[in-house]
Amino acid sequence: MNLDRLTELRKKKNWSLQYTADLLGIAKSTYAGYESGYRRPSLEALAMLADLFDTTCDELLGREKQKQTAPQAIELATWSSLDFTISVDGQPLSEDEIIQLITFIRTKRKVQEELS
């Protein structure tokens, strides 16, 4: 995790450790542990941090934004050619939502791999 980035984002907003922890609904010591590297946030906490600081989990983890690679494009083309629809709450997923779903799963797997 990019610890400097987490501290930088908090200080940019002029928030104290306590105020930030309160916004997240966690103990000050827990949040301070994230910034110092003593603790690692769960996936849920990482998502909350990204939302709080209006950034992405990838950015908090210090990852570069990646372009869609050829295998991803091929996978999506293959996916689009299949003759079925995936829906959530009775509404079919759009192509953008499918891309977001694939990206989410890949990111989750990478984060879990890094944390283990």
From Swiss-Prot:
Domain HTH cro/C1-type: 6-60
A GO molecular-function annotation: DNA binding
Any coiled-coil regions, as ranges: none
Superkingdom field: Bacteria
Keyword Iron-sulfur: no
Keywords: DNA-binding, Repressor, Transcription, Transcription regulation
Keyword Transport attached: no
Function per UniProt: Transcriptional repressor for the ans operon coding for L-asparaginase and L-aspartase. NH4(+) may influence this repression.
Cross-referenced PANTHER family: HTH-TYPE TRANSCRIPTIONAL REGULATOR ANSR, TRACRIPTIONAL REGULATORY PROTEIN-RELATED-RELATED
Protein name listed in UniProt: HTH-type transcriptional regulator AnsR
Organism in which the protein naturally occurs: Bacillus subtilis (strain 168)
The encoding gene: ansR
